[in-house]
Amino acid sequence: MATNKSIKSVVICVLILGLVLEQVQVEGKSCCKNTTGRNCYNACRFAGGSRPVCATACGCKIISGPTCPRDYPKLNLLPESGEPNVTEYCTIGCRTSVCDNMDNVSRGQEMKFDMGLCSNACARFCNDGEVIQSVEA
């Protein structure tokens, strides 16, 4: 019975990460002047707004290349974003929203293993697919 709950938790984690990953691919092609603009854009897109409409409404730009213009530097979700803590905050947020919810479902040795997998998935997601080994035993 506990195994079924663990499997369900992992499946839910993978589905949620898949949905979030799909959003990040879209967000990676927009640049905003500040964090407020980025939050506005994200909320607009989450509500179903189109990229051009959300970018115009929130003061952001849609780009086709890999880097943002100098006057639109904030949170473009690319390595050159100039935000050194973006990856750390992403990982913390992912672990808090996804992995901690799994931890509340059931406790046990299987759950610790699943939590490690979830943490590694969050780290890979937030580091643009780079594999990062977990230091947890």
From Swiss-Prot:
This is Thionin BTH7. Keywords: Disulfide bond, Plant defense, Secreted, Signal, Toxin. GO terms for biological process: defense response. Residues 75-137 form a propeptide. GO terms for molecular function: toxin activity. Its main location: secreted. It comes from the Eukaryota. The keyword Secreted applies. Disulfide bonds join C31-C68, C32-C60, C40-C58, C44-C54. Residues 1-28 form the signal peptide. GO terms for cellular component: extracellular region.
